[in-house]
Design a protein with these regions (language model features):
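Long, highly hydrophobic alpha-helical transmembrane signal-anchor segments
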Residues: 1-39, 111-117
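Lipid-exposed faces of alpha-helical membrane segments in multi-pass integral membrane proteins
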Residues: 4-11, 28-35, 89-100, 129-133, ...
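Structural signature of transmembrane alpha-helix termini at the membrane-water interface
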Residues: 11-18, 35-42, 96-107, 136, ...
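Membrane-water interface of alpha-helical transmembrane segments
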Residues: 19-26, 74-81, 85, 117, ...
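Membrane-proximal helix-loop-helix units in multi-pass membrane proteins
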Residues: 21-77
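Alpha-helical transmembrane segments of helical membrane proteins, especially in multi-pass transport
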Residues: 48, 73-106, 138
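Short, highly charged, low-complexity non-transmembrane loops/tails of multi-pass membrane proteins
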Residues: 52-60, 153-164
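Alpha-helical transmembrane segments and their immediate juxtamembrane interface regions
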Residues: 104-158
């Protein structure tokens, strides 16, 4: 995706398209990922369940036995679904912030030296404005999942991890 994004940015500059296309491009990639994550909730394999709650990462058998013992399986599934919604929301936040930042910063005609400088400034500011908050949201989602598993099973963190 990164290579495609760089190619699109270069294409916008070379074709001297309106600078608003930079904002659209900046918002499109995390927006599409957010839609894919959200869309995964209507499949048998929501993204959080596929990526995190799987036998390669966690001791799913042990966790499921504890959830069954405490009759928390349905509530746990609902919380995993909530975590998937939260992850989708984090990508939508990133998409919105990318768009706002690009509209605010990139104002010069495409293909100009000022346009290239603004792209550099956009990249620089995207870290504190978008990347760090998004990373904090992701860590919050992982904490939410861990806290959910711990509170519903009583298992310690070390007991949750899959053994190799």
């Amino acid at each position: 995706l990164g290579l495609v994004s760089v190619g699109i940015t270069g294409g916008i500059g070379l074709l001297q398209l309106d600078q608003q296309w930079i904002a659209v491009k900046e918002a499109a990639i995390p927006g599409l990922i957010g839609l894919a994550v959200l869309g995964s909730t209507w499949t048998r394999y929501p993204l959080i369940k596929t990526l995190l709650y799987n036998p390669n990462t966690l001791d799913v058998g042990r966790i499921q036995r504890k959830l069954d013992e405490t009759s928390n399986s349905a509530l746990f599934e609902a919380r995993l679904l909530n975590a998937t919604y939260m992850l989708s929301g984090a990508f939508f936040f990133s998409s919105l912030m990318n768009y706002i930042l690009a509209v605010w910063i990139v104002t010069s005609p495409t293909g100009s030296a000022a346009f290239n400088e603004e792209l550099g400034r956009l990249t620089l500011l995207s870290y504190p404005v978008i990347a760090i908050p998004s990373a904090l949201m992701m860590m919050g989602i992982f904490y939410y999942i861990w806290r959910t598993i711990h509170s519903m099973t009583g298992l310690a963190f070390e007991d949750l991890l899959a053994s190799r």
